[in-house]
Amino acid sequence: MQKILISLSVILLLSFCDGNKKNSSFQLKGTLSDSKAETLYLEKLGSSKQVIIDSVILDENGNFEFTNYTPKIGFYRIKTNDKNFAMLVLDSADKVTITGSVKDLGNTFKVEGSPETTIFIEYNNLSKSRDIKLDSLNKEFQVLMETNKMDSIRMDSLSAIFEAPYNSIINRTNTLMVDKISKNTNMYSSIMAIQALDPDKYSDLYKSLDAGLSKKFPNDKNVIMFHEVVERMLSTNIGQFAPEISLPSPDGKEIALSSLKGKLVLIDFWASWCGPCRKEMPNVVKIYSKFKNKGFEIYGVSLDQDKEKWMEAITKDGINWPQVSDLKYWDNVAARIYNVQGIPYTVLIDKDGKIIAKNLRGQELEKKIAEVLK
């Protein structure tokens, strides 16, 4: 039920596209209640920074209009401060009107004249509904844990009971999200929405969105970067030959993935700081012990930054298979090549070097390995 994720938005919003001085028919205006001459800011969003590009003081009736900026397609927000804001997806041809309360922009604002923002809100509402249900389920689980003293066996049993409704909530939301994205493959907002979906499971939808966005926004940097993500994803689909990677081991010796060809190889992406990875590691150790003399090998790739902590985890967890890392965290070259969006993450490669399974863990992984090696 747990996994450390890297948001796809981090990948997609690395570039920062500037807009232009006001030179088109673009409009962004509105009326906000509860106004006391507050200053309202228009901000362009990037992955690591936000830049204020315009500001306006609301008049005595709460009216405002931004007049100094024409946006390129992208993600923006209006705000009074960093805790009171509303997200927008704006384009240069929009004529946008916003209403709501200046005291609570995020929960009260309504927008007209921005098709992209309208779709973005619909996506966001799906995510909010999912998160509310998951939060309620988690609180129920925590209450049962706190009011009942449980051994590990009973704890696992309780977790199994809650896993079904958890998966039901996720699957229901994913079904609705897939349906909406499928109908909006030319909408820029879909870039953010699709990050909630597993690229391995929904590769066809990623391809459709890539095609739609590339046709409509061929020169947009974020769309170009999304295309590159999809290209990497396709190159590591099941049935493809595993791309080569070669990284240093803890002692500095380069170990190439291809050096293990001829064996059934599991690429195991993990990190010492990743709780779910460490929790899964005893199972990986058990699997390795069971199959290592039967033509099975593991190529461990750590997304660590701190070499000492990486080596401590190797020792503490009893890891005795090949381990490599460039100590570059999420910028790890192997993670980029294999389009890793979250850890733990696994890729199973047959003796000929072809990818035969992805993201298996626990009993599913052990069963698949036994099946291939029999």
Put a short name on every predicted segment.
Residues 14-16:
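C-terminal motif of bacterial Sec signal peptides marking the signal peptidase cleavage site
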Residues 18-175:
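A non-transmembrane, solvent-exposed segment enriched in polar/low-complexity residues
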Residues 106, 159, 167-241:
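N-terminal targeting signals for export/organelle localization
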Residues 224-258, 321, 368-370, 374:
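N-terminal "domain-start" segment that seeds a small globular fold
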Residues 261-262, 269-286:
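Conserved redox-active cysteine motifs that mediate thiol-disulfide chemistry
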Residues 279-301, 371-374:
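Conserved helix-turn-beta segment immediately C-terminal to the redox Cys motif
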Residues 311-352:
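Short, internal strand/loop/helix patches
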Residues 351-374:
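Thiol-/selenol-based redox modules, centered on thioredoxin-like
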